[in-house]
Structure formats: structure tokens, C-alpha cells
Amino acid sequence: MLCLGASASASALISRSAPAANEKFGLYAYGENLGGLSLFYADGLAYIGDPANSTSSTASSVSFKRESDSSSSWIANPNGTTKAEAGWSDELLYIPSSSSSDHQMGFTSSERSNETTSGFIFYGQWVMVELESGDISSSFYVREESEGKGVYSLLWNVTDEETAIPISLRSVEPSNA
């Protein structure tokens, strides 16, 4: 009986809600052999892993914020460096639009026709995308890159690639962080 009581009170301490409006948050990938690697920026694209292992000179950890609880566009800024050092700020996270042949996710300061910067939602701490059709999807994948050891491209809606690994994106840091 004591064990159950301890478990119940310990689980009550863990927040299960989405980050609040204007609260900074990071995103972490969980999947096969991926126990909470962080999302980072490099050359305008989204990657998973340690930015220190990236070969890009613009690699930077990212913090996001939503301007309101109903906002489905997420604003990214460098986390841990000054905006001047990073060379970018206030970029929107995007998924490739359904008309795009590319699956790589990234960051943009102004949405182009082959990019979708809205529709990002939380289900608790799990990231989902509400599509134009009204369907909700979490079709996130990663593929190991030559960009650096332990660095993965963050992909959207990959259905025809054997090297892509399905993942979940969450706002929860791994317990070993």
C-alpha cells in the first residue's frame, strides 16, 4: 500500500500540461534508440541531437514560445547564445506543405508556399499538427545525417523511406538531462 501512495504522489509532481502562452519550452525527440534528444537549428533547418556535434557554424539550441494558448505558430529563438552570436531570431518552425517534395522541417522568417508554419498543437506535452483538413497528425521522423555524429534530420510525413525512424516530439526533457 505504501508503494502505491508514493507512486501516486510522485506522479502528481510531474506536470502533464502543455507549456503556457509566452512560456519558453524546448522540444525533444523520443523513439527507437532516441531517449529525448533535443531539437536544434542549423542553417535554417531543424535537426535532432547535440548542436555541438553539428558541422554547421549556425548550429544552436532552440527555445520556443507560443504567443497565446490558441496560437498554432511557434516562434523559435536561440537558446544559450545571444541573438547576435547566432545570427537568427524570431523564426517560425515549419513542416513542408503537402505540395512539397521535401520532408525536412525547418525555420523561416516568412512562410513560403511549400511551408506550413501553423497548426502546431500540444496534446498534454506531446506535439501534434492540426492539418488543413482538420485531421490531427504526429508524423515526425528522423534520419541520421552526415551533418555530425549523432545528428538527425527532423522530417515530416515520410512514408517511403526505409532509413527514416518514427519519433514522438515532446516538451519534456529526458530525465537524464
List each model region and its residues:
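Cleavable N-terminal signal peptides of Sec/SRP-targeted secreted and luminal proteins
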Residues: 1-12
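Generic low-complexity, intrinsically disordered sequence content enriched
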Residues: 6-8, 17, 68, 97, ...
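Extracellular glycan/ECM-engagement signal in secreted proteins
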Residues: 13-47, 99-177
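Short, well-structured hydrophobic secondary-structure segments
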Residues: 52-98
